[in-house]
Amino acid sequence: RRKVGWDLYGLLGIGKGETAKTKAQHRRNFRFFDAPVGMIFTIHRKLETGSWLDYGMFLQSIVVAARARGLETCAQAAWSQYHKIIRAELGLPEEDIVVCGLALGHADWDAPVNRMRTDRVPAREFMTFRDA
């Protein structure tokens, strides 16, 4: 995850130690990267692991449905850092945990960030295949 962050900042021209630029880029999360739609997702704090897995699949379904309609998304973990403020501002119940934000809109394919490609671990490194 750290490598992805530094790769992203490199694309944006932000070097290590450039605190002001790093903070400015991080703050863009809280404007949903200028997307026209921003969503905050929450989950009841008593729900356990299986529910979190279901929630992840639910979020992925939104991402896939958006793409099928010509839209793009950006899932944003940064929102969970400020869960107390978000809960108060949105009037959310104390039992809800802020999971993430999701920006939704049309991608700017000329933006450097949208040219980023992350390294992927080959499936054989984390999966075991067996013959039936």
Describe the residue ranges of each PLM region.
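Acidic, surface-exposed loops and disordered segments
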Residues: 1-132
